[in-house]
């Protein structure tokens, strides 16, 4: 994803980036408390298991970078499908040949896993599952054409969804339905070293654009939550600007749920930058109010998305179970508060 938006989506860009030194080492501004005041927390629903989510993240990385049109990508996709089926979901694969910024035909598969498929009231939980083909934000320019492992930027969001599906199957108490959607072809956007391409923002979130324009199910979810880079060290999740503009009520719902679950320190009320991400076409084309849970590293010069974003360092060594726990438990809080 990128931090500026194309007029295709009819939105004004407002990017908030603060540059200091590249000494953030995966930490957001200040120290993130791993627990909030117990007296004010009122958690509901089952307990999210961060160890399990961590293992799901590692399992995806074990295939290697899940770059479009690669064997690792295809093998991991089959694994994701089987895991969702194992946890009682009805799974559909939405396939399409999509065109990358450079004309490359991308064999895309959106994985749609429906928990409690008979339920009419449904919630969308989504993340992308492909890896960035180029580490074009790496401090070392010799790495710019190497693929990204995408432990955080890809695998972590899918891992949280898999653990949520596992918990929902075991708990058997949630009455609403959940559509878990793994978007493909999110990270084939124009690399920084490529020149001469117009409308570069359109080259991102291709799978989500296809999903939103070719909606695959009869019942649309009431609202949606996008999980993007939800396992990074020291992450905090500011209220993303496009989410505030397009789905303010859902933003309030999610950030209040974080406080109730005991993880408000990970979800400050500050507003971050406006991000071109999968939630934008879902809002604009599918009409589903959807918010983006995405980190905002205030004092990291390398990127406001954190020091590993689109680098060869986006590996398991920088995945934090505490961050996975905060996000996973917050989503459970949202679902069980309906």
Regions found by a protein language model. Give the residues of each.
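N-terminal capping segment at the start of a domain
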Residues: 30-76, 87, 301-318
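Second-shell loop/turn segments in exported
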Residues: 39-47, 62-71, 98-101, 143-155, ...
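Bacterial signal peptide processing site
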Residues: 25-28
């Amino acid at each position: 994803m990128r931090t500026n938006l194309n007029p295709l989506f009819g939105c004004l860009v407002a990017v908030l980036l603060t540059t200091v030194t590249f000494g953030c080492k995966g930490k957001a501004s200040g120290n993130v408390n791993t627990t909030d005041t117990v007296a004010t927390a009122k958690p509901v629903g089952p307990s999210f298991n961060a160890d399990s989510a961590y293992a799901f993240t590692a399992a995806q990385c074990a295939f290697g970078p899940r770059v479009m049109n690669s064997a690792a990508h295809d093998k991991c996709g089959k694994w994701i499908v089987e895991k969702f089926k194992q946890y009682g979901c009805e799974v559909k694969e939405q396939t399409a040949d999509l065109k990358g910024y450079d004309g490359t035909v991308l064999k895309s598969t959106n994985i749609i896993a429906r928990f409690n498929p008979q339920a009419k009231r449904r919630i969308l939980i989504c993340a992308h599952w492909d890896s960035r083909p180029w580490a074009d934000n790496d401090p070392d320019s010799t790495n710019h054409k190497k693929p990204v492992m995408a432990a955080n930027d890809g695998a972590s969001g899918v891992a949280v969804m898999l653990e949520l599906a596992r918990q929902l199957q075991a708990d058997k108490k949630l009455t609403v339905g959940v559509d878990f959607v793994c978007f493909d072809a999110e990270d084939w956007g124009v690399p920084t070293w490529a020149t001469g391409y117009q409308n570069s923002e359109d080259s991102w979130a291709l799978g989500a654009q296809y999903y939103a324009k070719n909606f695959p199910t009869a019942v649309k979810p009431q609202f949606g939550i996008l999980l993007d880079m939800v396992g990074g060290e020291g992450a905090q999740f500011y209220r993303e600007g496009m989410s505030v503009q397009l789905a303010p009520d859902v933003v309030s719902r999610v950030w209040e749920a974080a406080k109730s679950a005991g993880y408000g320190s990970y979800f400050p009320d500050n507003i971050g930058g406006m991000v071109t991400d999968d939630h934008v076409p879902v809002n604009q084309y599918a009409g589903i109010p959807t918010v983006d849970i995405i980190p905002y590293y205030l004092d990291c010069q390398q990127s406001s998305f954190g020091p590993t974003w689109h680098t060869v360092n986006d590996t398991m060594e920088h995945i934090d179970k505490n961050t996975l726990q905060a996000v996973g438990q917050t989503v459970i809080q949202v679902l069980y508060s309906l």
